[in-house]
Regions:
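N-terminal Lys/Arg-rich, disordered targeting/topogenic segments
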Residues: 1-20
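Hydrophobic H-region at the start of alpha-helical membrane spans
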Residues: 22-33
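Solvent-exposed, non-transmembrane regions of membrane-associated and secreted proteins
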Residues: 32-284
């Protein structure tokens, strides 16, 4: 009698184990399919955003990599202009951005950044209230990667502050600010030294002087950039950080800095900063 009960008990346990196994397999399958679906949707959104940015670049005929010496739209710098701005040998590129058309797509677009010699060639956005909105929203408002190139509302849109920070994701395919990591090669600072910021009424030219690993401190609160001692201390700390420095570029007090910030894949508590100083500006 005991043997019969024991056999029945074993059968019940086996049956329960099989049920648990089936339930576990079904749950795992649902989880796997959910993850796969999420990845597919995320990848689709990312590719759609990349197509949107590519479309914008094709609509806005900025000078692209490899065309600087050929494009007839490049304005030659005259001798008189060089006398007015003796420190700038950067070519004046034609500002052909149609900001009216861009702002019909998104009113938060206020500038365009281009770094000839890299893949950086994007609109710049600023949300009026949510400083992190464009970290995870594309220009059409879609949530998720690759986000946008953006600044925070603390920074004037005419880049008149002593220090302006632009943020962008470090994408694996080098889009957004991913190609800033090219400046880990010291030769890149001289091969691709200029940053162009196109505004509705003028163009700003910056020269890159630093590409370093920095802490993830919130740069706008790092110091009072209006004070000479604070400004020069920041420049000194920046140029003492691990990375590459172009020591031929002067960064005196009173300069206007552009800091481009992106993440470092294996260092979540650090940021890769590319620092540039304003060397020229001209009307559109």
């Amino acid at each position: 009698m005991k043997e019969i009960k024991t056999k029945k008990g074993r059968r019940r346990r086996k049956k329960k184990n099989r049920q648990r196994y089936r339930i576990g397999s079904i749950a795992f399958g649902i989880l796997f399919l959910s993850c796969a679906l999420f990845l597919i949707i995320s990848y689709g959104k990312q590719k759609q955003a990349e197509r949107e940015y590519t479309s914008l670049r094709s609509e806005e005929p900025c000078v692209t990599v490899g065309q600087i010496a050929m494009r007839t739209g490049i304005a030659a710098v005259s001798a008189a202009e060089k006398e007015e701005i003796p420190h700038s040998d950067a070519p004046h590129l034609e500002n052909t951005i149609d900001f009216s058309a861009l702002q019909e797509k998104n009113a938060d677009i206020y500038a365009w950044i281009q770094i000839p010699g890299t893949l950086v060639d994007y609109p710049v956005l600023q949300h009026p209230t949510d400083r992190l909105y464009y970290l995870n929203h594309t220009i059409d408002g879609t949530a998720g990667l690759p986000g946008s190139i953006y600044s925070e509302a603390i920074h004037p849109k005419d880049f008149s502050a002593p220090m302006t920070v632009l943020y962008g994701h470090n994408m694996r395919n080098d889009t957004m600010f991913g190609s800033l990591h090219d400046y880990e090669d010291p030769d890149k600072l001289t091969d691709a030294p200029y940053v162009y910021i196109y505004l509705p009424d003028k163009t700003l030219i910056y020269q890159i002087f630093a590409a370093v690993r920095f802490s993830d401190t919130y740069l706008p609160d790092y110091c009072d950039y209006e004070k000479e001692s604070d400004f020069m201390t920041f420049v000194k700390v920046l140029c003492s950080s691990p990375g590459n420095i172009n020591e031929t570029v002067e960064v005196p007090y009173g300069s206007r800095l552009l800091m481009m910030s992106t993440c470092i894949g294996n260092a979540p508590n650090n940021r890769f900063l590319v620092g540039a100083v304003l060397i020229d500006e001209y009307e559109k």
